[in-house]
Amino acid sequence: MSPSLNEPERLNRQAQGLACNECRARKLRCDRVRPTCGTCESLGVTCTPNSVRQPRGPRKGYLKTLQSRISALERQWNGQQKAAGGSPGESPPCSEGGQTLRAVSESTSDGVHDEDHANGARPPSSQSSIEQPILQPTVSLDGISALHGFAPVNSPFAFALPGTDPSKTVDLFSHMECFPSMPTKLDPRAYVPQQLTPNSTMSNGQFDLPTDLSVTSEFQLPELMKADLSHLYFDRVHPFAPILNKRRYFARAARPVSEQGAMTCLQHAMWTLAAWLGSQFKHIQKDLYIYTRGLLEKWELNMHPGNPPIELAQARLFLAIYEIMQVNYERGWLSAGRCFRLIQLMKLHEIDVPDGISESGISFGEIEERRRTFWMAYSLDRFINLINKMPLTLNEQVIFTRLPAPEGAFQRERPVQTQFLSEFMAGDDDLQIVSPFSACIVVMTISGRCLSHQQQCMVERAYGGMPQDFITRHQWLEGILMSKGKAIVDCISNDLDDELTDPMLLFTNMAAHATTLLLGMTMQTGLCNYESLISGFEERATEAAQKILHLCQRLNECGYFKVHPFTPIPLVFCAEWAQGRKNQNPAFEPLHNSMLCSLRDLSVVNMLAETCLARLNDSNPQMETDMSKSQS
C-alpha cells in the first residue's frame, strides 16, 4: 500500500488534544470532544481533561547506546593509530564511523520527536534542539582509554592526562546536558572503572593522598582480622610504644560499639600501626590509614575541647608514628605537633602534682597509662627533632609526672611509686635497675639537652657570645653523659640476650652512644680554636661510633618488623660522624659504608631511614657512589 493512502489514516487516527483523566484511568480511547467527551457523557461524570502532560522519561537502552558509541570511537581511533603509527596526542578525525554514530544519534532523537508528535505533544527542549550534537571528546581518543588509568582530581570528571598541562583539566562528560532524553540524575562515575591507579598508590615511596579525608562510610574489617591486628600490635608495636595495659584494652574493646566513644579511634590507630608491621596486611594499610585519619578529624570536631579523652591522645600518637614511618616525615612531624598540644591540653605533664589526678581515686592502671602516654610523646618530641634540629615542644623543666613503672607492675596493675625525672637526673650515679622504657626516657632527655646546647651555640655565635659560656655548659653536659649515660648503658647491657630480644634496649644503647657523637659534633662547631678539648673528646666519640657499629650488626637478628622504628636516628649520627672524617682517615670509610647499608636495608619498611639517607645525600653528593662501593 502506498504512503499516500496511509497518510490520511495516520493523521485521522487520533484527535488533537489530551485525553481526559477518566478515560486515562479506565484506559479507554478518548474522543477529546469538549466540554464533555463521549465516555464521560455516557457515564454521567465530570470530564476533566489533563492539560499538563507528564514529562517523558529516558528511552530504554539509551545509556547502553551512549556507551557503545564511546567504545566504537575508541576501537576506531586505536585501529587508525595502529595502522598509521600516529602519535597518541593527535585528535581523532571525523570518519565514516563518526558519521554512522551521528546518524544513529539523529535517528534515535528523531524517533523520540516522531513519537511525541504522534501523541500531540512536544517537550519544551525540542523547540530549540532540532539537531542534537554528538558526544565529541575534548581530548584524544586514546586519552579516553587512559581514563581507566587515572583517578578523579578534586571534581568527579576532571582528569590530568599524560603529556598535557596538569593545571588544565578536561571534562569527558561536559556535553551530556545536550541530550534531552538523558536522565536528569545520571552519575557518569558509575560507568568509570574503579581501579587503583598510579595517583592512588605509593609514588616514590610516599602516599598521594586524596584531599578529602572525611569519613563517608564505615571501614569494615572482619572480626578475625581485628583480633589478629590487636594481637599483632601487642607483639610488635607495644615493645617500642608501651603505653597500653593489655587487660584493660581487651576489656574496653569488648564493650558495644555505641559505648566505646574515642576507643574506636584508638583501635583503628592501633590497627593502622600494626598493619604496617605485618606483611599480610599491606593490602589494607593505606585505606585503613585514610579512614583512621578521617575518623580522628570527625571525632575532634564533635569533641568538647575542655575534656578530651585519653584515647584521643593515644590515637594521635600512634598516627603520628605511622605517618613518620610510612607517609612522609613532614606530615608525621606536623601530626606529632597536634598530639603534643593535645597532651598539654590534658595536662599530662603534671599528673602527680599535689591533689592532682593521681590522688583522685582513679585506678593505678589508668593513671599509669596516662603517664606512659605523656612519656611516649616526650620521647617522640626528642626523636623527631633530632632529625631536623628543631626546637623541642615539651619542656623538661615543667614536668611533674613520675617516670613509668616497671612493665610487670604496669600489666599486673600493682601500684609502684617511681621517681620524678628531675630527681633521677640530679641523683647519685649508683642507679638501680630501671625498665627499658625509663632508660630510653633518660637517654633521650640527655639527647634533648645536647640538642638545645647545639642550638644555643648557634645563636651565641650569631650574636658574638663568649666561648666561656659554651665551655661551661658543654662540660656540664659531658659530665651528665659520662655519669648517667654510662650508668644506663651498663645497666641495660648486663643481659645480652634481653638486648637482642628487646628492641627498646638495643635502641637505647645505640642512642646513648649517638648522644656522645652529637655532643662531639657540637664541640667542633663551637670550639674550632680549642684543639686540646676537641682531641680529648675525639677519642671518646670514635669509641662510641665503633660500639654503634657493633650493635648495628645485631639488627639483622631482630628482623625488619621488630627493630625499633627510630633506629635510623643513631645510625645517621654515626654516618655523619664517619663522613666528616673518612677523607682524612680512610679507616672511617668502612664504618660510613656500614651505616649506609644498614639505613638502606631499613628503608625497605621504614621511610624514616629513607629520610636519613636523603639528609646524608644532601651533605655528600658522592653518597650514591659510596653505597655502590659498599654493595660490591
Curated annotation (Swiss-Prot):
GO biological process, any: positive regulation of metabolic process
Keywords: DNA-binding, Metal-binding, Nucleus, Transcription, Transcription regulation, Zinc
Record carries keyword Protease: no
A Gene Ontology molecular function term of the record: zinc ion binding
Residues covered by region (Disordered): 77-130
Residue ranges: DNA binding: 20-47
Domain of life: Eukaryota
UniProt subcellular location: Nucleus
Entries under CDD domains matching the protein: fungal_TF_MHR (cd12148), GAL4 (cd00067)
Gene Ontology CC: one annotated term: nucleus
Function: Transcription factor that regulates the expression of the gene cluster that mediates the biosynthesis of azaterrilone A and other azaphilones, a class of fungal metabolites characterized by a highly oxygenated pyrano-quinone bicyclic core and exhibiting a broad range of bioactivities.
Annotated protein name in UniProt: Transcription factor tazR
Originating species: Aspergillus terreus (strain NIH 2624 / FGSC A1156)
Gene: tazR
